[in-house]
Amino acid sequence: MTIESIIPAHLCETAAWPDFISSLCEEIRALAESEQSRFAFAESCSSGLAAASIGEIAGISQYFCGSKVTYRDNTKHEWLAVTRDTLNRFTAVSEFTADEMVAGLLTSTSEADIGIAITGHLGPDAPAEIDGHVFTAIGFRDESNTDSFRVWTQEIRLNCKSRR
């Protein structure tokens, strides 16, 4: 499985923010249902929107463990164990931060088999070259070693003109 099988490429290239979150939530719901797995979110730039969106799906409590909204760097470090070195070297808007967010989420959420991290920059005061730049990581707990995870990260450029 790859992240592209969960998040279609066309969505990553052209999606507006609400469409991206809605589609991501539907894909994650379908995956959790088919795998009979539970999942959790670690959200930064989405500020809990993924949790709120997935919470609208009837019966989702069977699969959804919860979400950690970690908007600030220090909160990412304290709640998800994202290293200060990663945040200083690569910033919060990086594949490295997304990877560590997923690992920290799965480490701290024992009943989740799947972790999804969303981090990025969505303005409103973002410079044009980074506005809409988002990294989404999806991690899967290794069945043979519950302290080991497989993580895929996708860089996404969202259509910033229609976030709401």
List each language-model region with its residue ranges.
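Short alpha-helical segments enriched in small residues
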Residues: 2-164
